[in-house]
Amino acid sequence: MRNVSLRQLRTVEAVCRLGKINLAAEALGLTGPALTLQIQHLERDTGVALFDRTRGGMVPTAYGLAFLEAARAVEDSLAALEDSIGAISGLRTGRLRLGVVSTGKYFAPQLIAAFRDQVPAVEINLFIGNRAEIIAKLRDHEIDIALMGRPPRDFEVRAQVFGDHPLVFIAPAGHPLAGVLEISRERIAREQFLVREKGSGTRISLEIFLSDTPHELEELGTEIASNETIKQAVIAGLGIAFISAHTIEQEVKLGRLVILDVIDTPIRRQWFTVSRLDRAATPAMQAFEQFVLSSGARYLPVVSKPYPANAFG
């Protein structure tokens, strides 16, 4: 195993990621036969099959997945080495792959811009996705840091709080419950809901909140995979929604949406910076984490009672 080369590891990673020899070869600047030969030599030298050849493409075996994990760990180490060399030279440089859950896209651009003003030499690659997608990318070494709500529990991470994340019920202006005080869970559960897709952190929080009522989310309403579409659907009168307060500041101020006074809300979750515990933080990661922990909260909209029109301070 000590003779496995970086080129071979990158070959395995490309085939795992793209699933087809021709696509992996194109990504690596090789011909298909040359890449196939590399895989065959590696399988011969290690004595294990790295891929199952199927009609749908190349599917990694358990051995192939182990090589994939090693390849990504090596790439992480090389990136850390590059950043460390820059840090030793007195340069605040490096690359940061940042994952942000979709709710965070309403404040992440301002936060990133402020960080870049302080550390302009750090290159940031941003990925936006739902909770499940962000966790998968963090697990697979495809992002360095995630900005998200509840940290994952199925692998060890380093999680640090940087701000509050309130979740609220919203309705269109003029809804019968607008202005009603202390709405019960049982009453709100009788409404037609517009809910996020499975895997969304907001949906998980709503399921927990309504868990002691005799209702299932599938019975309550329509599933929509976009906060923007949910907001527009609520404004159009298609139902109510449970959503991050960070996504509705402008609509509430303009009077297009109202926040409902449901008992025990806002539900105050927290925002975290999350990274893998088994990964040494690069200087770029350290600089970004320090910035977010010290200044990130100021970029979060602040929601407070009373309801509904002046909910944002």
Curated annotation (Swiss-Prot):
CDD domains: PBP2_CbbR_RubisCO_like. GO terms for molecular function: DNA-binding transcription factor activity; transcription cis-regulatory region binding. InterPro entries: LysR_subst-bd, Tscrpt_reg_HTH_LysR, WH-like_DNA-bd_sf, WH_DNA-bd_sf. Residues 21-40 bind DNA. Residues 1-61 form the HTH lysR-type domain. Keywords: Activator, DNA-binding, Plasmid, Transcription, Transcription regulation. It holds the Pfam family HTH_1. Transmembrane segments: none annotated. Belongs to the LysR transcriptional regulatory family. Transcriptional activator for the cbb operon for RuBisCO and other Calvin cycle genes. This is HTH-type transcriptional regulator CbbR. The gene is cbbR.
